[in-house]
Amino acid sequence: MKKKLINFKNALVLVVGDLILDCYWYSKNYYVVLEESLPIASINKIKKQPGGAANVAKNIAEIGGNSKIIGFIGMDYEGLTLKKLLNHTRIYPDLISIKKNKTITKIRILSEKKQLIRLDFQEKYISKKFNLLYEKIISSLTYYKVLVLSDYAKGTLVNVKKIITLAKKMSIPILIDPKGLDFKKYSGATLLTPNLSEFEQIVGKCHQEKQILQRGIKLVSELNLSALLVTRSKNGMTLFQPEKQPIHFPALSKTASDVTGAGDTVISIIASSLATGYSLEEACFYANVGASIVIQKIGTETLTINQLNTVLNI
């Protein structure tokens, strides 16, 4: 595929899903007290970043696209922090605050580029404001060109079938980063982007390449998908489409420092590409390059359009 400079300045992408505040606590001094077998981490740096669907919106903005993010947050300090982190000229945060819920927060403690432990503060959203969520989606789809549903199984997309139906009526491409053991609820989507582990939870463990290919083709048919993209970390990604041979995109690097947020990078680039007018094959090619860059970084890292173009034109 011919290399060229790309830009997503005209991309308009609506992102809906579970909003997460990602916190990183860095330690330069980590040791274990032998008498108590107690690990001690002296924290010297704290970093906070948008996570989940919020990271998708940020990724789109960082590569030059325009995103609107719709989702739930709690009426708490973490919710306010997440709002501030989404203060970007290319992000329009349309967040719904809920009194009864805390903002979903994940804290990762790291030392020497290794993750020691992750602490999750979360509960599924049970709200009377779902009708407001759907109203916001409907009004937004008259302007935005592509819909991304970022599902982390925290309750925002509890009725994902309804959202898919709404978007299909308006002929809007629907890209979904799926979660859980029920992929049937995503039937009729334009594209699903599970990682290999999520894919195998649905189709069974794949011990050979041909099993991945056969089961991918079958899943596209069973779920009536326009396409399925299985992301495979250091092994790249594989695209399945009805009545077409699978296309494999090898990773640029065979090592992965941290795959956190790589799926967000993939779906962000694909959404921005489709909203700009690129083909799905081109979009996946760009996404594979972007993911290969991001997995070399630690944490929920975003990619810039300059970084992407630099690697594309090496």
Swiss-Prot record:
Enzyme Commission identifier(s): 2.7.1.-
GO MF annotation terms: heptose 7-phosphate kinase activity; heptose-1-phosphate adenylyltransferase activity; phosphotransferase activity, alcohol group as acceptor
EC class name: transferase
Keywords: Kinase, Transferase
Disulfide bonds: none
One Pfam family in the UniProt entry: PfkB
Domain of life per record: Bacteria
One GO term describing the cellular component: cytosol
Keyword Ubl conjugation: no
Family: Belongs to the carbohydrate kinase PfkB family.
Designated name of the protein: Uncharacterized sugar kinase BUsg_057
Organism: Buchnera aphidicola subsp. Schizaphis graminum (strain Sg)
